[in-house]
Amino acid sequence: PYFFGIATKFEETMTQLGDRPKVRIIRMRKVPFIDSTGIHNLTALCEMSQKEKTTIILSGVNKNVHDVLEKAGFYELLGKENICPNINVALERAKSLVE
């Protein structure tokens, strides 16, 4: 689950990374649900990444998480083309952005 406890650790890890990549893929296949803190932190990461010119791609978002993110207006922030059904599609999307 992507909820309060893991959201803080995730945010800390993202801020400690060195070089800023052109694309960052976040694999969501093992995230059965997401709470409001998780949405807040994921949104903050996307906003920060936009400022740094890094594209965020989500991979493997299940229906429950998809519905929550959609209701929160998250897809307008990220762009539907950056929500991929699996890692292979996400990697192809990333490749198209860096070529």
Q: What residue ranges belong to the model's regions?
A:
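Structured cytosolic domains appended to multi-pass membrane proteins
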Residues: P1-E99
